Design a protein with these regions (language model features):
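Short, surface-exposed linear patches
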Residues: 68, 122-123, 165
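Canonical Radical SAM [4Fe-4S] cluster-binding loop centered on the CxxxCxxC motif
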Residues: 53-62, 99, 104, 136-137, ...
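Accessory C-terminal segments flanking Radical SAM cores
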Residues: 15-119
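Iron-sulfur (Fe-S) cluster-binding modules
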Residues: 2-5
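Alpha-helical context
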Residues: 12, 21-28, 126, 130-133
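Recognition helices and adjacent regulatory flanks at domain boundaries
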Residues: 107-140, 150-152
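A general structural-boundary detector
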Residues: 37, 84, 133, 141-144
């Protein structure tokens, strides 16, 4: 049977996805126990509402339209995200990331580890960990929602983003 790329299993019978998350946890924790690369490298942009976030779990927030006129990078590098990044670098848990903190407080790996362990995030680990907290970062994982005509019913979604909910 042919395996899909990413489904490889190591000698301990762990998937590559799980192994990458465990490695990510070790690396992230060298910066702080709240550091998450998704806050730097992921952008979920909802054009119908003007809202965005860097993960599926925290609440959406609005980018400053005036800041975007001066610098389109402000669409991702909002003041809100920069403050959350600063907290993470300092070892403070942003309250909006409570989904991950609950998982970790129960001894489990969280999406902080899984998302950060993916190649689109981990490849920039060294650059991000050594950059100033307020530096603008170009996201490598961009998801754009043009309208609510999506016909999927993802568990993390809602009626405002999917016509199937």
């Amino acid at each position: 049977m042919k395996q899909n790329k990413g489904d490889e299993v190591n000698k301990d019978f762990k998937s590559k996805f799980l192994s990458d998350a465990e490695i990510a946890k070790q690396k992230l924790d060298t910066v702080s126990s709240s550091f998450c690369l998704a806050k730097w490298k992921q952008l979920s942009l909802h054009l119908t509402t003007g809202m965005n976030n860097s993960c599926y779990h925290p609440p959406l927030h609005r980018a400053d339209a005036d800041a975007i006129k001066l610098d389109p990078g402000a669409l991702h590098n909002t003041e809100h995200k920069k403050q959350q990044r600063k907290m993470m670098l300092e070892g403070t848990r942003p309250p909006e990331c409570s989904y991950c903190w609950a998982m970790e407080d129960n001894g489990k790996l969280s999406d902080r580890h899984y998302r950060s362990g993916e190649p689109w995030a981990m490849k920039d680990f060294e650059t991000i960990k050594n950059a100033p907290w307020d530096q603008n970062i170009v996201p490598s994982y961009v998801e754009v929602d043009f309208n609510s005509a999506c016909n999927l019913s993802c568990s993390y979604c809602s009626p405002q983003y999917s016509s199937s909910w």
